[in-house]
């Protein structure tokens, strides 16, 4: 008979084992780090490291518009897309573009903008991939409890099954097509736009009639020529905003149409409140900075290369995909900003799923598998529905699993670290705060790793 395995390595302590603060609140979010695997002394040393490295100074430089994307010689000013401060970089330019997008969205919602025969628009097809799709889709899905008189359908990859499913039952005379691509060179987007154009043409929607059914969102000023639409049907992006950070601007036009500009403004407002908090809070009390520091610790000290995101709320199902792209495209790199090779781990592999469903699929692996995992468990205190008993069970599951996922047999050397994120009420405002919090975590991790989180050379190589 084989004897049980014995390991010399004891389980690491939890942050909660010390006397310091382990949870912080901001902008309707409560973030609890108590189940992460480090001591209060470890955390204090990490804070000192961040301060010595100039973490907050680097963050301030980004927000103020300095060239932080060194490889492309650009600023990274996604925060300007939601800023309410007239002194922020490009404020007037952003406001002008937003006002124009808002006016268009409201004209579609009110029925003032109609199809070529005078029919009101009932459906929007968003053609885009990556940052031009997953951000708006995450916002749209998270807002499923709000009135959505106009439906949005997201067409991303070149899978004809997806295309057929979207077009089935749609009336082309009541459909608006939004073609979104920062460069307007993304093959999947251009191919899909061509096929949908054929669908419109088959209904007789060509020439000037087509102008009532197709708009574009791009940083390429010639995109309207390529798409054969009037220049006034082109809405701008800028090269100082990366695609995965762009949901706050014109890329969000489908959400503006579906949800209304008042709702979209609340979304921007929540993000701006988080921006102000993160800008001002010291590292030791800054939830984005602490998320980044603990992720850095997990990756470089504990060799935890996996990050699992587990929302216990259907509305945040697509948020997992958004966070996956944000983190892996930003931090999946092996060289520093100066071109030298990084020795050791950088960004983690991000995956996850709806927490309640995942309990019956991969939680077995999380609990007893041979890989260490860092876990973000997200829940909402107020339900997005009227079924109180269902919500009570869901929240009980989330709280119990937060503890179960860090409970291990002491004879095993593998372990998890769990951060719980509790949202008081998932509204457009707190959704904006949540997404901005993660954005700041990622850009700060770029500083900690010494890499550029704003370029994507691997993606560009793949396009070739």
Describe these PLM feature segments.
Residues 2-117, 391-399, 403, 423:
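Extended, charge-enriched "interface" segments that sit outside catalytic cores
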Residues 122-127, 176-180:
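A short, small-residue-rich loop immediately preceding and capping a beta-strand
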Residues 146, 159, 167-464:
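A SIS-like phosphosugar-recognition module
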Residues 17, 127-133, 181-186:
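Ser/Thr-glycine-rich phosphate-binding loops at phosphate-binding pockets of nucleotides
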Residues 90-114, 139-141, 145-176:
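Glycine-rich oxoanion-binding loops at beta->alpha junctions
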Residues 125-148, 357:
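Glycine-rich, small/polar surface segments that engage phosphate groups of diverse ligands
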Residues 118-122, 302-305:
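A short, charged/proline- and glycine-enriched loop
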């Amino acid at each position: 008979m084989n004897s049980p395995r014995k390991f010399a390595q004891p389980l690491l302590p939890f942050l909660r084992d010390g006397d310091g603060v382990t949870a912080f609140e901001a902008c309707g979010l409560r973030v609890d780090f108590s189940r992460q695997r480090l001591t209060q002394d470890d955390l204090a040393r990490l804070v000192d490291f961040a301060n010595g490295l100039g973490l907050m100074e680097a963050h301030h430089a980004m927000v103020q518009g300095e060239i932080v994307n060194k490889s492309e010689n650009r600023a990274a000013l996604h925060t300007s897309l939601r800023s309410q401060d007239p002194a922020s970089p490009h404020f007037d330019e952003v406001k002008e573009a937003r006002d124009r997008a808002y006016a268009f969205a409201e004209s579609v919602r009110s029925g003032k903008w109609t199809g070529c025969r005078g029919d009101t628009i009932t459906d929007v097809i968003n053609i885009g991939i990556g940052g031009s799709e997953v951000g708006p889709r995450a916002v749209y899905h998270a807002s499923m409890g709000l009135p959505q008189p106009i439906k949005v359908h997201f067409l991303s990859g070149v899978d004809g099954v997806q295309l057929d499913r979207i077009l089935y039952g749609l009336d082309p005379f009541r459909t608006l097509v939004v073609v979104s691509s920062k460069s307007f060179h993304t093959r999947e987007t251009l191919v899909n736009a061509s096929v949908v154009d054929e669908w419109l043409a088959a209904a007789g929607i060509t020439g000037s009639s087509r102008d009532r059914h197709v708009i574009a969102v791009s940083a390429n000023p010639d995109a309207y020529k390529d798409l054969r639409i009037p220049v006034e049907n082109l809405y701008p992006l800028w090269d100082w905003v990366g695609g995965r950070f762009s949901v706050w601007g014109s890329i969000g036009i489908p959400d503006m149409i579906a949800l209304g500009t008042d709702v979209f403004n609340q979304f921007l407002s929540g993000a701006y409140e988080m921006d102000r908090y993160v800008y001002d809070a010291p590292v030791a009390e800054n939830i984005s900075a602490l998320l980044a520091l603990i992720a850095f610790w997990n990756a470089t000290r504990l060799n935890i290369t996996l990050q699992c995101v587990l929302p216990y709320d259907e509305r945040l199902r697509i948020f997992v995909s958004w966070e996956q792209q944000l983190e892996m495209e930003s931090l999946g790199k092996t060289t520093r900003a100066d071109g030298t090779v990084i020795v050791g781990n950088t960004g983690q592999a991000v995956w996850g799923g709806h927490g309640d469903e995942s309990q019956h699929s991969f939680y077995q692996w999380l609990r007893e598998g041979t890989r260490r995992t860092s876990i973000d468990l997200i829940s909402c205190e107020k339900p997005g529905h009227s079924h109180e008993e269902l919500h009570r069970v869901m929240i009980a599951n989330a709280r119990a699993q937060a503890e179960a996922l860090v409970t291990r047999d002491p004879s095993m050397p593998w372990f998890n670290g769990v951060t719980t994120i509790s949202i008081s009420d998932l509204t457009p405002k707190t959704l904006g705060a949540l997404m901005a919090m993660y954005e700041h975590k990622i850009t700060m991790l770029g500083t900690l790793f010494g890499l550029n989180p704003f370029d994507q050379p691997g993606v560009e190589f793949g396009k070739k």
